[in-house]
């Protein structure tokens, strides 16, 4: 058996308890990693792998990072989904005989990050837990440890429902029992890209019982208990900033599944995976980090409560009507710090003096914000204003105690104001007077010795000294100057008087810094008493920030206040896609009407590719979402129903990880909509059935339309290239044909992007290919084939080098005819390769439009 050294034994004993984490093992000024941790970390962090003697024949793999710069390395590991266990020395090496005791003081995981550098200001960092009750329901709880938010609910024991909750929250980590983890599919684990943590204990810790209310179900309490136990065991510190668990019902909000949110690009773009080009990007003019986080929550969960929607609309109207007051509000909000996350750091003991200065400056703004809101006539804004707690006693205490110029470090003094503590003032006076005496000493010694270059200095190693150049040492009186340090060109001395004063000064400074740290710690502890009040204040300020953002964006983009219909009808005049309009510019964008009511439940949309069908469908959904989050909408007039759910199938979001084809995903999403939609839902289906054979696809598309019409009665926009389906208008009373218009000018197609009544009369597919600059010979051949297909009952035409009139009917399409007179140029070939490499199925209409402009610019 291998006999390791005592230190390696200690490492292995601790590592055994944290098998799923990198163990940062403190040795002096470094965090060291050994064995497999070292091998993996050296590659991930790109740091040098070395070895250390550990009692074995060969050196043990080792790598390390300096403790003072470890946070950057920790952030890298966390961002990649790993966990890091911080193991510190918990005994003083100077007073300990033998091996210094070490313990893990914190486990940092993707869901438990508290360091500001590892968090995104306008994004929550959620950790969730799951409790499966008899296979029937899931108790579900989640928290943002950095803000103290804690919420819970009960959902159906369905993987789809669970995925919807997890993706809505952008959850970073999920806590499950070992048996629950086994039940969840591997596909789900890979798709979600979150960290799974196994934890069995699920009873509420005694000290946290006050966070749970009695009316919560057993499964909900168990989910909360599992979450709290995990946080308690991994954080190993006070979690007093966690708020009382708030129960929420998913039925109180508009439901959208993961694919619908992705297709509509609410908070993340399909192509760039960022905020740019999303609805959140457009609507976000929040001035505070916490306001930005609340705005995302609002967009993720639109309201279905009519009164709450109207209240928000009233607030936005009021803010729009008071332009100058709104400007003043914005200026005040700019100076409000992230109160939510500050409260979390106070609980953790991580705040510094600068944080407290920012807290004080934030609290200064609250009376001003309150006064501005009270000057308006909105009842709900008045209610919000009255909820603003300026925490006057805290503001006064911070004003009295903390210097405006306080440093970040809390151990080096310069934090507490003069006059705050009499003993501190005494120490400071002693230090200042001593330094004045030393400055005077330098003048006296120069006069006494006649050495004009003599100076009195100080360093941390030797303390105070008198420095004389070598050339002048002979001028010093004998017996009074004691040599302290020899330099290349000078000698440093000390005198009895200087030695005595040095002790007084250094003692005073040491005591001053010790007392100052103690006083700062007392102030920091005092702030803990205000955590709950600060969290409530943060919530009110965040809501105000979101409302002013809606007002600002609505005004700048010419949005109007929508009316909520009572009969479920939708009437939008000159509606626009808010994001596309922003990117293209209002002058370039073509607005369109949309009407859906009991006589027009289904709009069947035909028209060529690139004409704007998908954009039109998306704009209807985004208009509804804007209305139900309480914002104004991009239109000239709008009467909108309150939708309980939105389902979309737009574009080809192939589920490659699950091994499902485009068509299978299409059918699964269609089923999801058909089974769960109600008469109050909105369904957007873009070219359903295109992933299979023509007649199969057409048959399925027709059957789906008929089923929605006869059984579901949801408001539906259904785009298709199956022109035959337009005949359904004669059979289905609630279906209306509309099309995106286009015209031919000089043999070229011009897309008007205008929605008109009735079916499209032509496809223009070949014209789209021509716009993409496909070779001329290819376009001409396609035109001849199309002409024959249209004239010959759509039979397949064999390729031939003969003229069209000499071609006979065949059932197999062969090679294109050879046209020696015209070969593709190198420029055409290059463009063809670029077009061929494009992943069209992953492009949004806006992406495709931008790419087309880019290709055109290369030609011209």
From Swiss-Prot:
InterPro entries: DNA_mismatch_repair_MutS, DNA_mismatch_repair_MutS-lik_N, DNA_mismatch_repair_MutS/MSH, DNA_mismatch_repair_MutS_C, DNA_mismatch_repair_MutS_clamp, DNA_mismatch_repair_MutS_core, DNA_mismatch_repair_MutS_N, DNA_mismatch_repair_MutS_sf. The keyword DNA-binding applies. ATP binds at residues 607-614. GO terms for molecular function: ATP binding; ATP-dependent DNA damage sensor activity; damaged DNA binding; mismatched DNA binding. PROSITE patterns: DNA_MISMATCH_REPAIR_2. Keywords: ATP-binding, DNA damage, DNA repair, DNA-binding, Nucleotide-binding. Signal peptide: none annotated. GO terms for biological process: mismatch repair. One of its GO terms (cellular component) is cytosol. SUPFAM superfamilies: DNA repair protein MutS, domain I (SSF55271), DNA repair protein MutS, domain II (SSF53150), DNA repair protein MutS, domain III (SSF48334), P-loop containing nucleoside triphosphate hydrolases (SSF52540). This protein is involved in the repair of mismatches in DNA. It is possible that it carries out the mismatch recognition step. This protein has a weak ATPase activity. HAMAP family: MutS. Belongs to the DNA mismatch repair MutS family. This is DNA mismatch repair protein MutS. It comes from Listeria monocytogenes serotype 4b (strain CLIP80459). The gene is mutS.
